[in-house]
Regions:
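Mid-domain Rossmann-like dinucleotide-binding core that forms the NAD(H)/NADP(H) cofactor-binding site
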Residues: 142-224
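NAD(P)H dinucleotide-binding glycine-rich loop of Rossmann-like/cofactor-binding domains
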Residues: 94-177
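N-terminal Rossmann-like NAD(P) cofactor-binding module of classical short-chain dehydrogenase/reductase
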Residues: 89, 242-243
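Short amphipathic alpha-helix with an adjacent loop that forms part of the alpha/beta core around
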Residues: 225-236
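Glycine-rich beta-strand-centered segment in the early N-terminal region that forms part
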Residues: 25-41, 54-103, 134, 139-141
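Glycine-rich phosphate-binding loop and adjacent beta-alpha segment
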Residues: 193, 201, 245-313
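Phosphate-coordination loops involved in phosphoryl transfer and adenosine-cofactor binding
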Residues: 5, 169-171, 239, 261
Length: 314
C-alpha cells in the first residue's frame, strides 16, 4: 500500500462519465487539522448538483465528492482533545471563526466557509482532513454507518424544526414531499418533539412508510388538494408549521395550509425557485417565512448527543 495515495471518488469533469474511483493523493493535515479514516459516507442530492453542474459553487476540478462522513481519527493535532482511533463524525463546513456570523455562533453564514465536497475535497475517500474543531467524538459503541448519514439530512431537519421559532409539543406540522432524506428526518424529529405530523407525497408507498413511522395522516397530492385535506384534518384552522423543500409546485398549497400566524420553513427548491409570493395572504394572515440551510456547530452537537443516546437514527 502506498502511504501517499488513497482510493477516492473523484470528479474530473462534469457528468456521470467524469466521476471515477481512482488513486488520489492522501491529504496531509495542516497544523490545526485532524485526519479521519472514513468508515461511512452518506449520499445526497448535492452530490448530483456538483457532478452535473457545480451549482454555481466556487470550486476546482478534480474534486473528491461527498459532504458527510463518520469514521475513526487517524491523526490528531496536539491540544485538540481528539485521540487516534477514536470514533468521530464530521461537521461538513470548515469555518473561519472570526467573522460576525461565526462570533454569533452561526457557522452556516460564515463569510469564508469551505464545505466538504463543494469548495474542498469531500468524504468519498479513504481519508479526509478537516479542522479539528469540525470533529465531533462519538461513543465507542456508535454505529458508524448510521452516523455517516446523519450530518446533512438530520442537521438540516434539526434547524428547520428548532431554529428560528421552534416547533413545540402539541403543534401540527405539514412535511411536504416525504420521500427525501431531509423530510424523513423532519418526521422523526417532529414526533420526538411531541408534535403531530401530516405528510405529502405522490407515492402511496412513501405515505404508508411515513404512517408506519408515526405520521398522523398522508396526502397524495396527485389525488387530492393538499390545503383542503389539511383544513379538514385540523378543524378548518390549518397547521402551525410547514416544512418545504419543493418550491414552485407546492408553494401555493403550502401557504394555504398554514393557520393564521403560522410559519413556513424552506430548505430547498427542487421544482423551481420562483413561486408566486401570494403576499396578500402572507401579510393579512401574518404568516412567517424562514429560509434554512444546514445547522450550526452547537446544533450539530445537540443532534449528536440525541443520536448517542439512541434517540434518533437515519
Amino acid at each position: 500500500m502506498n502511504p501517499t495515495t488513497m482510493k477516492a471518488a473523484v470528479l474530473d469533469r462534469r457528468g456521470a462519465e467524469g466521476l471515477s474511483v481512482r488513486d488520489f493523493p492522501r491529504p496531509e493535515p495542516l497544523p490545526d487539522e485532524a485526519l479521519l479514516r472514513v468508515h461511512a459516507a452518506g449520499l445526497n442530492r448535492v452530490n448530483l448538483y456538483m457532478r452535473d453542474s457545480g451549482a454555481g459553487i466556487t470550486h476546482q476540478l478534480p474534486l473528491v465528492q461527498g459532504v458527510e462522513a463518520a469514521g475513526t481519527v487517524a491523526h490528531a493535532p496536539a491540544g485538540s482533545g481528539l485521540r487516534v482511533g477514536q470514533k468521530a463524525i464530521l461537521f461538513s463546513s470548515a469555518f473561519c471563526g472570526r467573522c460576525r456570523y461565526c462570533l454569533q455562533g452561526d457557522q452556516t453564514l460564515c463569510l469564508h466557509a469551505s464545505i466538504m465536497g463543494e469548495h474542498r475535497h469531500g468524504t468519498f475517500a479513504e481519508f479526509i482532513a478537516m479542522p479539528a474543531v469540525c470533529f465531533v467524538p462519538l461513543p465507542d459503541d456508535a454505529d458508524l454507518v448510521a452516523a455517516g448519514a446523519l450530518m446533512v439530512g438530520h442537521l438540516t431537519a434539526w434547524r428547520m424544526l428548532f431554529g428560528k421559532r421552534a416547533l413545540r409539543a402539541g403543534e401540527t406540522v405539514l412535511i411536504v414531499g416525504i420521500g427525501s432524506g431531509v423530510a424523513v428526518a423532519c418526521l422523526q424529529l417532529a414526533l420526538k418533539a411531541g408534535a403531530r405530523a401530516i405528510v405529502t407525497s405522490s407515492s402511496d408507498t412513501k405515505i404508508s412508510r411515513a404512517l408506519a413511522l408515526g405520521a398522523e395522516a398522508g396526502i397524495n397530492y396527485r389525488n387530492e388538494r393538499v390545503s383542503e385535506r389539511v383544513l379538514a384534518l385540523t378543524g378548518g384552522e390549518g397547521v402551525d408549521m410547514v416544512l418545504e423543500s419543493s418550491g414552485e409546485k407546492s408553494w401555493a398549497e403550502s401557504l394555504r395550509s398554514l393557520r393564521r400566524g403560522g410559519r413556513l420553513v424552506t430548505c430547498g427548491a427542487t421544482t423551481g425557485s420562483n413561486p408566486g409570493a401570494d403576499l396578500q395572504r402572507v401579510f393579512i394572515r401574518q404568516l412567517e417565512i424562514y429560509g434554512s440551510t444546514g445547522g450550526s456547530l452547537a446544533e450539530f452537537h445537540a443532534l449528536i448527543a440525541l443520536f448517542a443516546r439512541g434517540g434518533i437514527a437515519p
